[in-house]
Swiss-Prot record:
One GO term describing the cellular component: cytoplasm
Broad class of the protein's primary localization: cytoplasm
Location of the protein in the cell: Cytoplasm
Name of the protein described by the UniProt record: 3-dehydroquinate synthase
Top-level lineage group: Archaea
Cofactors named for this entry: NAD(+); Co(2+); Zn(2+)
Pathway(s) per entry: Metabolic intermediate biosynthesis; chorismate biosynthesis; chorismate from D-erythrose 4-phosphate and phosphoenolpyruvate: step 2/7
PANTHER family: 3-DEHYDROQUINATE SYNTHASE (PTHR43622:SF1)
Provenance organism: Thermoplasma volcanium (strain ATCC 51530 / DSM 4299 / JCM 9571 / NBRC 15438 / GSS1)
GO BP terms in the entry: amino acid biosynthetic process; aromatic amino acid family biosynthetic process; chorismate biosynthetic process
Annotated residues for binding of NAD(+): 70-75, 128-129, 141, 150
Pfam families documented for this protein: DHQ_synthase, DHQS_C
Highest classification ranks of the organism: Archaea, Methanobacteriati, Thermoplasmatota, Thermoplasmata, Thermoplasmatales
Binding site for Zn(2+): 182, 243, 259
Membrane-spanning segments: none
């Protein structure tokens, strides 16, 4: 399938998106406009796709390549300092281009480097997982972890181009399932074209649908982010659908459950909470469950994880104020509301979900 090009304006920045098979081939042409280029690339991606990624040596007169290990531990001040030291030693100036090629953690670190080095350099994002393509590469957020707190240091900074190459997704059902949890979230939030598209496609014919799914995801998230770019008014919090329970699951399992699985089951539980307290139509629960099955995402056994363990981590969540948490719940397909949920209400919802699964 041919690549699709479109432009999204976000917080006054015009961001060019190139989406589709072999979209990365456009990188050489764009990078060639710069005399000095910094490439921050995932070692895993570099090894797996050595024959697919263009030769970075052909990008410009001066190329600094920094290969990085994936994972949350990458996002540290120490790694940031190491990279800045290399850039200074190589005399990289603020007219340079920074390109990152990798998943969400590489993007988080690269975005922070691009936004702070010499007070900001131009950046091209080449996210290589579906989760990064539909979520973390959109919205300007980047971040470093410090003192065991995730993303406590960070900025809002947009790339001027995002290249979403769908070749990186082929024959990798795990990264498709991980990303589809967030895409299903968009379908529940927005309804319309995204919901219809996901019901026409499936994990079995994902390749044929990938470009359109990514394009719709970019547009939905951008629309929401544009109304609350700096995440100050609460509008952007709708994107946290599924994440309240997901954070509890991830904490209770010490990260052994993947983010995508946690978010998908989180949406189901939050919909149960909404239904129990009169805010959610039952059809939403069935819609989430059907889409999860359609894309091969299994429901987690929360009984094994332990409702008390999940609730304990949620109770420590920074968003809890005055005994309740502002939690987005779907009221119907295409509509999400914010519900003031107490610990008791969350506990009831988790137990209702467990009982329903035990009975099925």
């Amino acid at each position: 399938m041919d690549t699709q090009r479109f432009v999204i304006t976000m917080n006054g920045d015009n961001i060019s998106f190139i989406v589709g098979d072999n979209a990365i081939n456009h990188l050489s042409e764009e990078a060639g406009k710069y005399d000095s280029i910094v490439i921050m690339i995932s070692k895993t991606v570099e090894e797996m796709y050595a024959n697919h990624i263009p030769d970075v040596g052909s990008f410009g007169n001066s190329v600094v390549k920094i290969s990085l290990n994936d994972g949350e531990s990458l996002k540290s001040l120490r790694n940031y300092q190491k990279i800045v030291k290399v850039l200074l030693e190589r005399k990289v100036d603020r007219r340079s281009l920074l390109v990152y090629i990798g998943g969400g953690t590489v993007g988080d670190l690269a975005g922070f480097v691009a936004s702070t080095y010499k007070r900001g350099v131009m950046m091209i994002a080449v996210p290589t997982t579906l989760l990064a393509q539909v979520d973390s590469s959109i919205g300007g957020k980047n971040g470093l972890d410090f003192s065991d707190v995730k993303n406590v240091i960070g900025t809002f900074y947009n790339p001027y181009m995002v290249i979403d190459d769908t070749v990186f997704l082929k024959n990798n059902s795990f990264i498709i399932r991980e990303g589809m949890s967030e895409v299903i979230k968009y379908a529940i939030i927005s309804g319309g074209d995204m919901y219809d598209t996901l019901n026409r496609c499936s994990i079995d014919n994902f390749d044929a649908c990938a470009t359109n799914i990514i394009k719709l995801s970019v547009k939905i998230k951008s629309e929401i982010v544009n109304r609350d770019f700096y995440d100050r008014t609460g509008i952007r919090s709708v994107l946290n659908l599924g994440h309240t329970i997901a954070h509890g699951i991830e904490g209770a399992t010490k990260g052994s459950i993947s983010h995508g699985k946690a978010v998908a089951t989180g949406m189901l539980v939050e919909a149960h909470i909404g239904e129990k307290y009169g805010n959610t139509n039952h059809e939403v629960i069935e819609a989430i469950r059907d889409l999860m099955k359609r894309y091969g995402i299994e429901e987690l056994n929360l009984k094994e994880i332990g409702p008390g363990n999940i609730l304990r981590y949620i109770s420590n969540d920074k968003k809890i104020m005055e005994g309740y948490i502002n939690m987005p719940v779907p009221s119907e397909i295409g509509k999400v509301i914010t519900m003031k949920a107490t610990e008791r209400m969350i506990s009831d919802g988790i137990n209702t979900f467990i009982k329903e699964n035990d009975a099925s």
